[in-house]
Amino acid sequence: MANQNINNDVAKKEKTYWEQAIYDARKYGVNLNGMVVCLDNGHGKATKGKGSPWSLHKVEPAIPLREYEFTRKVTAKLKELLEAMGAYVYMVCPEVEGDTSLSARAARANNLKNTYKKTGKKAYFVFVSVHADAIGDGTKWMPGSNGWAVWTTKGQNVSDTFADCVWEAANETFTPMGMRMRQQKANDGDPDYEADFTVIKKANMPAILTENFFYTDPTDCEFINTERGVEAIAVAHAKGIGKFAQRRYGFKTRDSYTRPVDPGLLLEKENS
């Protein structure tokens, strides 16, 4: 029996970071059954200038990164985590080619919410637009301009609470990893930056836009170019969404896996 216990302990220690994250989400995470998360992976392949100095101009150090590829890696991992927690996840922009407009992205999420509302069933909708940040014209690395940040629209509303929760989870995740957290000067009491970005301004639900480090800073870019970096970003978002569901809507943690709610809706593909 003693040997069996030792073997079990060894097996637990051998879980990868991601395997442990999925296990924790299913075993200890907030039960998000009844939550619909609209995930927007920022930008498309055709969006110009969205890449590291190496990817755009072969400026060393040789750290390749394209924002559209990075955001799709993050949202794919985040979808997996959120579904493990019981949420229904709607991928706002599954297409890669082209550059789907910001208004179209918000409209897709709004259409899903409006269509579901007509069924008379209850669900809580949130919108998350995932990006990476940059500074300069992309022709050189800009060390020192770095860190993680979250944005909401101007003024105080429920999205500020959402942003607070995700910022807290990101801080808990990234600070121990030695990564910088950014926040606005505390003139309105919360850490999020504010701007009326179209994609979150037009989303008719609590909506945030996250800037997941700078691909123009070598240290940040190297971090988000790794599997561990992508996974940590997904974990931070999932924990933050769970915090918001608890704080705002009274969702509870759970002891066992719950299958995700499926609104049972198929939206026709929209023209971008």
What are these regions (language model features)?
Residues R26, L102-A123, S159, F197-A203:
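Mature extracellular/periplasmic domains of secretome proteins
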Residues I6-R108, G136, G144-N146, L266-E270:
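Active-site histidine-acidic residue metal-binding/catalytic motifs
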Residues N33-M35, L82-Y90, T119-F127, T173-M177, ...:
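Loop/turn elements at helix/coil->beta-strand transitions in domains of secreted/extracellular proteins
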